[in-house]
């Protein structure tokens, strides 16, 4: 089992293999983005796409075990490798491959790794030296219909009342 970073020029060749898993993973993340955004951002070289691959299998569908999407984020005091998506089947066979992403991050000059994940991932990553430092709390904000109101050369947003 190996983790293979997909070069930008090869992304189109594997996209049909990984797109569904990316779409499904994003369905759990507030649905504020979609797989098209991941594809476009990866094509701009702002995301890195990796596939979890077992080359000993005969069929392509059997070789593919999952996908990882990472992002190098530049912050004021250093770079961070953010694991944006990690998903796949038979996780126990490949979870150790996070070390390959860590090597990549080190080569890119990152000072740390980070990810926001569902609670079950904490146990997996604790076994690889990660620790919980924060909790993410979310609340959906319902947007009211708004209309633009013009008054004396000023533009304001006002709630639309029916």
Place the predicted regions along the sequence by residue.
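Acyl-donor binding region in acyl/amide transferases
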Residues: 76-128
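Short amphipathic alpha-helix that is part of the acyltransferase structural core
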Residues: 1-33
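Long, low-complexity, intrinsically disordered segments
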Residues: 153-162
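Active-site rim helix/loop that mediates acceptor-substrate recognition in acyltransferases
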Residues: 27-51
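Conserved donor-binding loop and adjoining core beta-sheet/short helix segment
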Residues: 44-91
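Accessory recognition modules or surfaces
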Residues: 72, 94-102, 143-152
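Active-site/acyl-donor-binding loops of N-acyltransferases
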Residues: 116-119, 123-152
